[in-house]
């Protein structure tokens, strides 16, 4: 999927109390911008119908006269209810129309909407919600959990620093209707479906209104007006919200004079509703039992929710608690977080009321880029280029192995066997000839042999990885992520490459080369398995190794005099004095002199049997492919 520079990503945070809209371009990485609607960046989630002006939203819906059916607080999972889906559709359609008319968005195929929902909403509710949003004018819409948006916002805004990225983080999103908790570990959501679906700042709005009505001098009349004209009740509740926000913007400011507003209801005669909050009054409200919270207070319920989150996180307690959502501006929420999470840093996001909208736009952009990124990675992995890269480097590996065998077999197999013959532990040259093969097998299978071969494979593998990275670097550049994020990790699952002789791979000694030893030790074991070919030196016995054995026997024969029949001499048990006629240093010198020829014969034997290594090629490519798949899973967390 190619990145279309013209695609607009709209993050639409339809809140219970307020709504915010953010815009991001698919081709960019900058922070999404908050779009204003009718000059305001935070839109009151309210909708009404006017006899001449049609559908009104936000403050316009509240302030206009002669409106009918003023609806507020209509975000709910109960989408089948008329008082939920009707105002929701009207509100969304109006916001989209305004954005189109003001040319804030283009619309059509180039505008993609990403709308948030509480993490606790079921998949069925989300599908129904998306359907309603499409009816509201969002032709291309995706519903994302707000927990995902909160995580992306926290990452992109810099609240999750590099030193915190590996630790646990708790994001607390306090909205008007719900409080959602998102536990993050290694930049991935670990827990997101816990919180308080009924605990939101809107409950305090209702509590303030209820107390205002109960203390009003014309209480009965006011209750009757609200019953007959719900629009007035909605207006007063919204004013209660504004007074609450006024109070929490600076609680100390209202110690002597209460935060207050007055509402004039256009009744005959007019009725005034005075809404006032003092520190004492707010403290009483916070501790008042609420029916919506099963008789518990807002303060107590929030603290219990924090304690529940702490318990759910278990041993992985957060290093950072990030507060988002407009209701997080209530300072006591951060104080309670500090009481419960004593070891964590407590941070309230800048402009918390816009966090989810920005997070939705960023998450949408990341999701689309991630799809394109995975498609490009998959295209590379299925192209055969990885296998071709390994195949091109195989001759270099065979040369390294040939050099290793030429020296190793001479030093660790032939010379020790010669010493044993010279001292009489091996009776005849025929026995010496017969013992070379099992000694070669034993040395190649030993820890010493494997470790020596691993040094060779290390050099080869180190030369292979840059060739692989040349294939992946262009993809990293396209998506602006570090090259190292899409590279082969130090461990590959190579055990399935070929049958490895039992006991050959000692998992306890696989760290002798550091992390890379995990790969090269297994690769070395596979190479040894191929060389031994069913327990014998199948690739070497008849050619290279036979050449080396013949060299030693020939030296012994020459030391005893010309004309001696080699076949006869092989079966003779020579006296110790005769065996001493040829020194170990002479044999060692001859082996060194013939090493290049021996190495060439081994290289030819290996290269002539390259088809035997086909499954090594295939499985090496498959293992690198699997490793890159895993790297891609982590790399997507870096896409912005």
Residue ranges and their predicted role:
Residues 129-159, 163-168, 204-205:
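Hydrophobic, small-residue-rich alpha-helical packing segments that form membrane-like cores
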Residues 16, 219-226, 230-231, 358-526, ...:
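Acidic, glycine/GT-rich loop-and beta-edge segments that sit at the periphery of enzyme/chaperone cores
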Residues 2-32, 158-191, 360:
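Gly/Thr-rich phosphate-binding beta-strand-loop-beta motif of the actin/hexokinase/Hsp70
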């Amino acid at each position: 999927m190619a990145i279309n520079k013209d695609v607009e990503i709209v993050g639409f945070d339809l809140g219970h109390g307020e709504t915010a809209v953010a815009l991001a371009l698919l081709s960019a990485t900058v922070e999404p911008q908050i779009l204003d609607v009718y000059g305001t960046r935070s839109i009151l989630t309210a909708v009404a119908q006017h006899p001449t002006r049609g559908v009104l939203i936000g403050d316009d819906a509240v302030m206009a006269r002669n409106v009918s059916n003023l609806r507020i607080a209509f975000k709910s999972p109960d989408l089948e209810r008329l008082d939920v889906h009707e105002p929701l559709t009207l509100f969304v359609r109006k916001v989209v129309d305004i954005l189109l008319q003001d040319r804030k968005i283009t619309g059509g195929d180039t505008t993609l909407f990403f709308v948030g929902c509480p993490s606790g909403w079921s998949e069925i509710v989300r599908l129904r919600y998306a359907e309603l949003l499409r009816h509201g004018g969002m032709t291309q819409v995706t519903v994302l959990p707000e927990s995902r948006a909160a995580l992306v916002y926290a990452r992109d805004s810099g609240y999750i620093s590099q030193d915190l990225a590996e630790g646990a983080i708790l994001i607390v999103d306090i909205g008007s209707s719900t409080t959602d908790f998102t536990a993050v570990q290694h930049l991935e959501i670990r827990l997101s479906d816990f919180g308080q679906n009924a605990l939101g700042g809107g409950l305090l709005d209702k509590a303030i209104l209820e107390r205002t009505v109960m203390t009003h001098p014309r209480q009965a009349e006011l209750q009757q007006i609200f019953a007959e004209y719900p629009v007035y009740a909605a207006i007063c509740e919204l004013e209660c919200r504004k007074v609450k926000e006024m109070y929490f913007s600076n609680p100390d400011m209202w110690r002597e004079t209460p935060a207050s507003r007055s509402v004039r209801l256009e009744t005959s005669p007019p009725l005034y509703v005075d809404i006032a909050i003092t520190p004492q009054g707010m403290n009483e409200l916070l501790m008042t039992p609420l029916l919506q919270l099963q008789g518990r207070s807002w303060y107590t319920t929030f603290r219990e929710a924090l304690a529940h989150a702490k318990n759910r996180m278990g041993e992985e307690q957060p290093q950072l608690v990030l507060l988002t959502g407009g209701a997080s501006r209530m300072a006591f929420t951060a104080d309670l977080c500090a009481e419960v999470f004593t070891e964590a840093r407590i941070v309230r996001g800048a402009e918390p009321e816009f966090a989810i909208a920005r997070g939705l736009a960023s998450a949408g952009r990341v999701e689309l880029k991630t799809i394109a990124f995975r498609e490009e990675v998959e295209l590379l992995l299925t192209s055969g280029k990885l296998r071709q890269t390994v195949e091109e480097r195989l001759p270099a590996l065979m040369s390294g192995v040939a050099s290793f065998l030429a020296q190793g077999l001479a030093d660790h197999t032939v010379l020790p066997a010669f010493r044993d013959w010279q001292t009489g532990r091996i009776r005849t040259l025929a026995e010496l000839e017969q013992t070379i093969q099992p000694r070669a097998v034993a040395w190649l299978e030993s820890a010493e042999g494997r470790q020596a071969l691993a040094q060779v494979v290390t050099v080869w593998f180190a030369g292979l990885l840059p060739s692989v990275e040349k294939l992946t670097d262009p993809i990293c550049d396209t998506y602006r992520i570090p090259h190292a994020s899409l590279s082969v990790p130090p461990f590959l699952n190579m055990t399935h490459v070929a049958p490895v002789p039992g006991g050959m791979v000692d998992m306890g000694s696989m760290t002798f080369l550091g992390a890379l030893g995990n790969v090269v030790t297994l690769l070395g074991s596979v190479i040894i398995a191929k060389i031994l070919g069913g327990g014998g030196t199948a690739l070497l016995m008849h050619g290279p190794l036979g050449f080396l054995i013949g060299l030693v026997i020939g030296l012994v024969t020459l030391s005893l005099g010309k004309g001696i029949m080699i076949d006869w001499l092989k079966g003779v048990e020579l006296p110790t004095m005769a065996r001493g006629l040829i020194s170990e240093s002479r044999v060692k010198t001859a082996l060194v002199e013939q090493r290049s020829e021996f190495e060439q014969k081994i290289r030819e034997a290996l290269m002539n049997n390259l088809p035997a290594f086909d499954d090594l090629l295939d499985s090496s490519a498959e293992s690198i492919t699997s490793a890159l798949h895993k790297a891609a899973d982590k790399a997507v967390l870096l896409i912005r």
